[in-house]
From Swiss-Prot:
Name of the protein in its database record: Aromatic-amino-acid aminotransferase 2
Subunit structure as annotated in this protein's UniProt entry: Homodimer.
Gene3D superfamilies for the chain: Aspartate Aminotransferase, domain 1, Type I PLP-dependent aspartate aminotransferase-like (Major domain)
Keyword Iron in annotation: no
EC number, as in UniProt: 2.6.1.57
Amino acid sequence: MALSDRLEMVNPSEIRKLFDLAQGIEGIISLGIGEPDFDTPEHIKEYAKEALDKGLTHYSPNIGILELREAVAEKFKKHNGIDADPKTQIMITVGTNQQILMGLATFLKDNEEVLIPSPMFVSYAPAVILAGGKPVEVPTYEENEFRLSVDELEKYVTPKTRALIINTPNNPTGAVLTKKDLEEIADFAVEHDLMILSDEVYEYFVYDGVKNYSIASLDGMFERTITMNGFSKTFAMTGWRLGFLAAPEWVVEKMVRFQMYNATCPVTFIQYAAAKALRDERSWQAVEEMRREYERRRNLVWKRLNEMGLPTVKPKGAFYIFPRIKDTGLSSKEFSELMIKEAKVVVVPGSAFGQAGEGYVRISYATAYEKLEEAMDRMEKVLKEKKLV
């Protein structure tokens, strides 16, 4: 039987391979998983139960229920400065990951190029390939806190370039683009007539008084931007699989068509729960409590990593930290395997996030504070015993 050429070009995530290696090891501490360790707030669960009891278990419109789209529109206007019509410019999806491929499929032609800042979230390049395009990695650097610069973008743009993916706050580096960064990127996109996919799933988890900005809020940028977001990180709802986006009407119309023949619609009763959650002050109190705890954990891990001899930029957002391990003489994969076998700690090799990730590892601090302390102790012990720092 013939296999799809495109699927053959997409490899399984290195992260999953690492988790397979760690399985069965007693006493393992995983700092590899990219999801909140917090449970979904109780009132959101209650809203879902209420929706079930009301029989809201049938198909919804392919675009998502209007009640949720209206709540999302309110959120975009209040928190992001984005004015989107809930009837035609907002869509509900099955998680946010799905939006990358669907969004690219609305405009990307075969062999057109998509610029992706590297290190990058593992789903971006495969989505570009599956949509028929060519991913082009644009390196970001530790010296610039891993923030994307237009100077680097200019080195990689070609007549075939059709789009740019940005992710702020960033997975895996924790970088947050400034308003000035976004203004320069916006000018670059206009100059080269590019579409932008802006992944903002970590938007509420920023630290040290930093503010996160949406590029679609800048003058003239809504018409060329797909603002991707969801409930997984914000409300600790990873298993619920519910996302939302704002985009020009022509993009939404095509993405709805894709969803129609792919997932049909997101889960109906979950949509009703999410609509109420967005308008409930308790939800935002929970977000702020999570943000404060993530910041406390970040401070611990950043301090300990630097103290043990792994130079580390202090991340401004998300819940990841990206220490440099080059001076150990190990590749990022070798370092990660050593930590699993000797320290019983899972960290993800930077190479899993693109070429610019080599020489680093990703650590998630979405783990209990006490476990983070123990993990740092174990890592430091192994590094010193092996004389790697």
